[in-house]
């Protein structure tokens, strides 16, 4: 998998951006179900952050506004950012919060934000698409701009997941596993090495999903 073509530039395309959003808003799809489950976990983590009106949160990459409705419940100011203008166009109506401060196009490895600007940075559906060097750049930048919390998702590589992927590849030739699933120990080591402490971790669905969401603290 090429990081540049399959991730960084992939969703700067209206057709692909729309297809991404449709997977969790239309029909009964496994992706839609797991993303719904993920929202429950994210909501619980956000509650733990105890925001007030002086706080701010960064949703990056915001994609098509997947968690915009959840964020609307909180009194903190919200900023959404993505490298894809096409994705942000689709997210235009997904952040109803009166404290929404708008969209800003940026690369998550090199954002224009101030150090310690946000009480929480949310990074979803990204890390499993990145090679190790880019993951390190992302974590370094996220550490720089948060002053307290990070909510971040990964896809975990494990023996059980390998068995599941093998079964699904037989059942459905169209099944494509996460392009860069990572062993749990590697994830923990990467988070700790950049100064982030894991407070909570939760699998979306045990065995059936490789996705795990972490709440970490600076």
Task: Specify the residue positions occupied by each region the protein language model found.
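Class I (Rossmann-like) S-adenosyl-L-methionine-dependent methyltransferase catalytic domain
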Residues: 1-56, 63-110, 134-137, 151-218
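Short, well-ordered alpha-helix to beta-strand connector turns
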Residues: 75, 118, 146-147
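Short amphipathic alpha-helix with an adjacent loop that forms part of the alpha/beta core around
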Residues: 113-116
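A conserved beta-strand element that flanks and buttresses the S-adenosyl-L-methionine
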Residues: 122
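Short catalytic micro-motifs in class I SAM-dependent methyltransferases
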Residues: 125-129
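A short glycine-rich, Lys/Arg-flanked "PGG" loop and its adjoining helix->strand segment in the class I
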Residues: 136-148
